[in-house]
């Protein structure tokens, strides 16, 4: 049988309540799954966006025409902006966890893939019909921002 002093050393002076607080703090540090997911996606896409911008500055400058280089840089710029937007989605998922934050996150990812992706491919391949696909990615960006705003409004 343990003495009171031994239990206090193990559980703290509040016993089980202290354990619950400790467990709760660990849960808060870990965050909710969607918050972590959006933050991780944002960081990974940010790495890719910065790499794409650096590749344009150092690897593509001598290989692409000025017009195609500008197209690539536009793709990288919007890629980075919306990777940052995913960090805002992570915050919104923490603050106002609702379906609109999830929708915003997926729309931003779709926008990066369609808008920036089509421009990346267009700039290096010259496939002109990709220019017709690009605005669909822009619509995803717009819908993502509208969804994020609605999530905040709804609270």
Residues covered by each model-derived region:
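Polytopic transmembrane helical bundles with strong interfacial aromatic enrichment
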Residues: 27-155
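Short polybasic linear motifs
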Residues: 16, 25
């Amino acid at each position: 049988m343990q003495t009171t002093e031994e239990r206090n050393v193990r559980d703290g002076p509040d016993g089980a309540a202290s354990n619950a607080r400790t467990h709760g703090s660990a849960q808060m540090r870990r965050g909710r799954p969607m918050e972590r997911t959006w933050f991780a996606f944002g960081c990974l896409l940010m790495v890719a966006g910065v790499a794409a911008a650096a590749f344009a500055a150092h690897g593509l400058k001598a290989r692409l025409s000025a017009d195609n280089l500008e197209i690539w840089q536009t793709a990288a710029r919007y890629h980075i902006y919306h990777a940052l937007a995913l960090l805002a989605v992570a915050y919104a998922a923490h603050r106002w966890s609702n379906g609109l934050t999830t929708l915003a996150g997926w729309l931003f990812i779709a926008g990066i893939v369609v808008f920036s992706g089509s421009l990346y491919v267009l700039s290096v391949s010259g496939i002109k019909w990709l220019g017709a696909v690009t605005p669909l990615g822009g619509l995803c960006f717009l819908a993502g921002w509208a969804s994020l705003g609605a999530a905040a409004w709804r609270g």
